[in-house]
């Protein structure tokens, strides 16, 4: 069997080498010719899996090691009779930890604020519910908005109420453009007008959920602290926007070693189910041991002392700013940052909690 895989997928050879010939390709530039005689295609979010890519091919299975599916033309896949799978929730823990790290980087005193600090979570799916749990471990008050999901453990509120009451807002929704609850440009001029000027905004979901022009106007007006891991016009990022952000990172919020490995394992399991193979591999067997920070110490004390050792978000911010050339970060530089990213470990690898 011929298997075409994005060259940046983790542990591809470990999970798939026994099934056939794996050809590693650059995901963003994948062509119909690359996949024409392949039976399986393994991708990330940078590959648009559409009708022009998959029609008249030997493909029987497409696996995307990602939470989202907006890069997959599901209708075209099903029309062609191609089984598809994604990895919903694979890096949810990593994203939740990213958000908390960003907040503590901006204001370390949040560790002491308990319920005086209100975190508003927009989207209560795989990431949102984990973030809520982790935030409550720190004593923060959590409010959430999701038209499709209610969490018993938090206060569920309207979108407008969340915008007005939260001290920080973190976005965790898929990108949708149709329907009553479309998320495209959910954060527009009207939403920014409802936010308190000192409310922190974090987007680690999908870039176009935030209308960039409205965001720029809002920061100019309020001097709001904004953290972006995703961008509306990604992979190209303007220097104008970058200079306004409190923190910027190159779409790596979910880039933990565990998250990457878990994503590949999830599409491996779906692959095995499709082709009738036994599922007998686990990513945990491939991960090196880490220093234990948490098990013998208080959670807040560890985060106060070790947070930048567990994940140095300031370095990621510096790296993306160093890529500015002629007024912008270009696609090649952005992709290289992601390709060469030194995968961090989740808190649990250091003996810490996980949701």
Swiss-Prot record:
Residues reported to bind NAD(+): 146, 229, 254
Source taxon at top rank: Bacteria
Gene Ontology BP terms: pyridoxine biosynthetic process
Keyword flag NAD: yes
SUPFAM superfamilies cross-referenced by the UniProt entry: Formate/glycerate dehydrogenase catalytic domain-like, NAD(P)-binding Rossmann-fold domains
Single GO molecular function: 4-phosphoerythronate dehydrogenase activity
Active-site positions on this chain: 206, 234, 251 (proton donor)
Cell location: Cytoplasm
CDD domains: ErythrP_dh
Predominant subcellular localization, coarse grouping: cytoplasm
GO annotation, cellular component aspect: cytoplasm
Keyword Phosphoprotein tagged: no
Pfam families with a match to the protein in the record: 2-Hacid_dh, 2-Hacid_dh_C, DUF3410
Listed pathway(s): Cofactor biosynthesis; pyridoxine 5'-phosphate biosynthesis; pyridoxine 5'-phosphate from D-erythrose 4-phosphate: step 2/5
Annotated substrate binding sites: 45, 66, 255
Catalytic activity: 4-phospho-D-erythronate + NAD(+) = (R)-3-hydroxy-2-oxo-4-phosphooxybutanoate + NADH + H(+)
Keywords: Cytoplasm, NAD, Oxidoreductase, Pyridoxine biosynthesis
EC number in record: 1.1.1.290
Family of this protein: Belongs to the D-isomer specific 2-hydroxyacid dehydrogenase family. PdxB subfamily.
Its biological purpose: Catalyzes the oxidation of erythronate-4-phosphate to 3-hydroxy-2-oxo-4-phosphonooxybutanoate.
Subunit and partners: Homodimer.
Protein name (Swiss-Prot/TrEMBL): Erythronate-4-phosphate dehydrogenase
Gene that encodes it: pdxB
């Amino acid at each position: 069997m011929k298997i075409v895989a994005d060259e940046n997928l983790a542990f591809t050879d470990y999970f798939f080498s026994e099934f056939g010939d794996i050809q590693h390709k650059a995901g963003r530039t994948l062509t119909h010719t690359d996949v024409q005689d392949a039976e399986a295609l393994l991708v990330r979010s940078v590959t648009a899996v559409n009708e022009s890519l998959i029609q008249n091919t030997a493909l029987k299975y497409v696996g995307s090691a990602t939470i989202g599916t907006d890069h997959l033309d599901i209708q075209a896949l099903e029309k062609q009779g191609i089984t598809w799978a994604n990895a919903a929730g694979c890096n949810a823990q990593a994203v939740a930890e990213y958000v908390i790290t960003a907040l503590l980087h901006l204001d370390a005193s949040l560790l002491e604020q308990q319920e005086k600090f209100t975190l508003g979570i927009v989207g209560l799916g795989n990431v949102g519910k984990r973030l809520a749990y982790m935030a409550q471990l720190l004593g923060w008050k959590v409010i959430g908005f999701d038209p499709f999901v209610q969490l018993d453990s938090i206060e569920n509120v309207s979108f407008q109420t969340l915008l007005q009451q939260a001290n920080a807002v973190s976005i965790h929704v898929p990108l949708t453009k149709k329907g009553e609850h479309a998320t495209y440009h959910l954060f527009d001029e009207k939403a920014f007008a409802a936010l308190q000027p000192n409310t922190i905004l974090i987007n680690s979901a999908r870039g176009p959920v935030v209308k960039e022009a409205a965001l720029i106007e809002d920061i100019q007006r309020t001097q709001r602290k904004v953290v972006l891991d995703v961008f509306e016009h990604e992979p190209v990022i303007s220097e104008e926007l970058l200079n306004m952000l409190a923190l910027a990172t190159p779409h790596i919020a979910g880039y933990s070693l565990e998250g990457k490995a878990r994503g590949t394992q999830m599409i491996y399991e779906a692959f095995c189910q499709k082709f009738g193979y036994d599922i007998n591999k686990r990513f945990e067997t491939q991960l090196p041991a880490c220093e234990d920070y948490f098990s013998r110490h208080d959670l807040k004390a560890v985060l106060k002392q070790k947070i930048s050792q567990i994940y140095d978000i300031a370095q990621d911010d510096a790296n993306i700013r160093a890529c500015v050339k002629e007024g912008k970060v270009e696609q090649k530089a952005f992709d290289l940052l992601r390709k060469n990213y030194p995968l961090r470990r989740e808190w649990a690898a250091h003996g810490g909690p996980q949701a």
